[in-house]
Each structure stands twice: as structure tokens, then as C-alpha cells.
Amino acid sequence: MKRTKLTDFDSKTRTKIKARDEGCIFCKMLYKMPETYEYGMSGFQIMHYVPRSQGGLGIEENGAVGCIYHHNLLDNGKNTRKEMLELFEEYLKSLYPEWDKKKLMYRKGMSR
């Protein structure tokens, strides 16, 4: 299977992640919430822990729901990425005790 297919969240995986998280994981943590922000007002997206650009797989263990605000902050925020990734990792580890970052990355010859 091609890398692009394996790094994308398919519809089945997206559905499972949305049902599992029930909204933005960072909003639930009240992480850097602007005073004027209303929960979910910007819509929701599925975020990769290991980015697709780095071979991050489109699997449940590599994704979580984020609102557009927090997803943008994770990808483009100044001085927030490290802290957000630590929180993201803690969240995923709480769900998957055997969670291992190395298992989230594409390797040549793998299949879904």
C-alpha cells in the first residue's frame, strides 16, 4: 500500500476517533483558551501526533480530535508545540497503555 494512503485517516478510523474523543482534547483540558472562544465554535478536525510529513500513520493511536483553533496552535503556534505534544502523548498513552511513538510511523512495505 502507498505511503499517502497509509498516512491518511480513512473514514472508519475518523469515525472511531471522533466517537472516542467526543470533541477537542485540548479544549477539554482548557489549554490556552482565548477569553472569547466558545468550545468547538471553529469546528473539529483529526490531528496527527506524528505528522503525515514525517510518515505518521492514519491510525487511532496517532490521532485525536482537535478544534481548528487548537489544531492550528499545534501546527503553527509559537512556543506551544512541545507542550502540546507532551499533553497529546499523555492523552494517547492513557488510552493505549502499549503506545509507542515508533509504531506510529510509516515503514516501507507495510500494509493496513
Which stretches of residues belong to each language-model region?
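Short cysteine-rich loop/turn motifs with clustered Cys
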Residues: 8-45, 67-69
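Polybasic, low-complexity binding patches
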Residues: 2-5, 53-64, 72-112
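Catalytic metal-binding/acid-base residues of hydrolase active sites
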Residues: 30, 50, 73
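Short Cys/His-rich Zn2+-coordinating modules
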Residues: 2-12, 46-53
